[in-house]
């Protein structure tokens, strides 16, 4: 009997999703399997909106950005319906079985892996592929989407150098990365940023300002500051760590809820932090400062050759796992090879930048400030 494969893309879009869909689909079809694509993530599976994917659908999509299936951030166990949040896991399981699926392949980041793992615990066969421009998925060397976003961020820094130099300005460039700084770090090093601020290394703004003034005294009348959106000051990091530690220790529900609210309020206070940092640097240095937020530019456009290669090989390796009956795994990139990693080793973890990572050490050797 032909195997039936379901595919969906969930979470934020990024370059390489279509390449991965193509890699899975064409390989599966070549082995006589049927492929169903569910539209708009887990919501499409819940609403039973789908398209049968054949070579006609999969032709010509390798170089396209985005995802032909559409995506959403809906969670099976927390689906927004009519203004209410409803657990639709059972409906999703029913639709899975109604299509006689042998496996559901979920392309997404850490949140998608977590949602897929919950479905696996309910008895569904699932496989995930690591997709995120943040490159923060635990268990894989790299995620597709990262390389393309890195190229976009580096090109932006290259372009900003000329205007910063011409006007003798500080230019602060906000780069995506909420809890991990891989993208800002890579772009900062490759783009020659003078300061790089990432979530893993809390900064002191006075140290950043002094590094800029030191450049100015040496005749360098401009500076580029590459900052991850989730970079925080030492003061903020201390407050957050205190609350998180208290939450971990607290058993009483009411107190836990209070601590969760305090953490949420603290994160709200952090919104707009990059603009505040840019303004504060202007005050501390006396140099004109401008902020550029790259935002969703980093998610769009044609995937790089590296992302096409990565997404394709992870897609074909996914079908190998399906044929071997290996489920409940993420297909990880390990060097030049692919490896199925159990989802329980992946979920609720982040791949963070270690303080001794070669990119960090090289940047420090070059005199780049991390604000610490």
Where do the model's predicted regions map?
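Short, acidic/small-residue loops that bind anionic groups at enzyme active sites
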Residues: 32, 38-39, 119-143, 150, ...
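Short beta-strand segments
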Residues: 8-9, 38-39, 70, 106-108, ...
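Short, hydrophobic alpha-helical segments
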Residues: 161, 216, 319-326
